[in-house]
A protein has these predicted regions:
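Glycine-rich helix-loop-beta junction characteristic of Rossmann-like nucleotide cofactor-binding loops
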Residues: 11, 69-76, 138-139
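A basic, amphipathic helix-loop patch mediating RNA/tRNA/ribosome contacts
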Residues: 1-45, 80
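S-adenosyl-L-methionine
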Residues: 103-156
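Flexible, glycine-/basic-rich loop-and-beta segments that form/coincide
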Residues: 231, 236-280
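Conserved SAM-binding loop of SAM-dependent methyltransferases across substrates and taxa
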Residues: 87-98
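Short, glycine-/aromatic-enriched active-site segment of Class I SAM-dependent methyltransferases
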Residues: 177-194
Length: 280
């Protein structure tokens, strides 16, 4: 359905908002105006929202924009890879931040917004599974990577994605606990409603990153929730100190510890669920 596809691709924050956009005549499928929210979103046809007054092609752009600001990531002049590009919210942010080129990688087809698809700085890599990424697919190789993926764990995406980077390597990942937690830890509607699960998931991902020869040096809360109201997190990943990683002042980055994770999770719950008691 068109309304569900709008939410899934980050073009609307809820099904109600998606239906309203269709009724207002702002939704286009393959160049033609969508008539009903219940119509099928046919594969291969680009779904777009016009005049929606968003600064990016999808609301997901707000998430990466927050990460670039919070972690002090400079995309100017860099070659980047967006793993799980979908409509292109992250790709759009990178371009607006001055990226020289963005490889937009997605396993799907026809999802990327037409404006980005026709931008000379964007290399569209559709029908490309993140698990199969290798350095040989990129010329030139990217130094900055970002990812926003669904229905797959970062543990499957990060190993190949990190390996394609070269130069001043850095990676920003959106962590979606609903796709990382055990099935029994995810509540009705696919929503994680336990802060302890958030801490557990983030701790596991941070430790996993360490096994890859990288380290998570920054963690922040996504400024907006996922489509079903899930709290999401942003992770700043750099090569380990042994690889010579340094911040702007020449200092080696510090690893995140359990206390850091607990503080960020508590801040997230205070923002999105102020009446809830965070477990300790």
């Amino acid at each position: 359905r068109i309304d569900a596809a709008l939410v899934e691709r980050g073009l609307a924050g809820s099904l109600d908002e998606a239906r309203l956009l269709v009724m207002e005549g702002k939704v286009y499928l393959g160049g033609g105006k969508a008539e009903k929210a219940s119509d099928k979103a046919k594969p291969g046809l680009v779904l777009t929202v016009r005049d929606n007054k968003l600064p990016y092609v999808s609301r997901g752009g707000y998430k990466l924009a927050r990460a670039l600001e919070a972690f002090g990531v400079d995309a100017r002049g860099r070659v980047c890879v967006d793993v799980g590009a979908s409509t292109g919210g992250f790709t759009d942010v990178l371009l607006q931040a001055g990226a020289a080129r963005v490889y937009a990688v997605d396993v799907g087809f026809g999802l990327l917004d037409w404006r980005l698809r026709s931008d000379a700085r964007v290399t569209v890599m559709e029908k490309t599974n993140a698990r199969g990424l290798t350095g040989e697919l990129f010329d030139p190789r990217p130094s900055l990577g970002v990812t926003d993926v669904s229905f797959i764990s970062l543990e499957a995406v990060l190993p190949p994605a990190l390996c394609v980077l070269e130069g001043a390597r850095r990676f920003v990942a959106l962590v979606k606990p609903q796709f990382e937690a055990r099935r029994e830890d995810v509540g009705q509607g696919g929503v994680v409603r336990d802060s302890a699960v958030h801490e557990k998931v983030l701790g596991r991902i941070v430790r996993f990153v360490d096994t890859l020869g990288w380290q998570a040096q920054g963690l922040d809360v996504s400024p907006i929730t996922g489509a079903e109201g899930n709290i999401e997190f942003l992770l700043d990943i750099v090569p380990r100190e042994a690889d010579g990683a340094r911040d702007g002042l020449g200092r080696a980055p510090e690893r995140l510890c359990e206390a850091d994770i607990a503080r960020v999770v508590a801040r997230a719950w205070a923002r999105f669920h102020p009446d809830a008691e965070v477990e300790r």
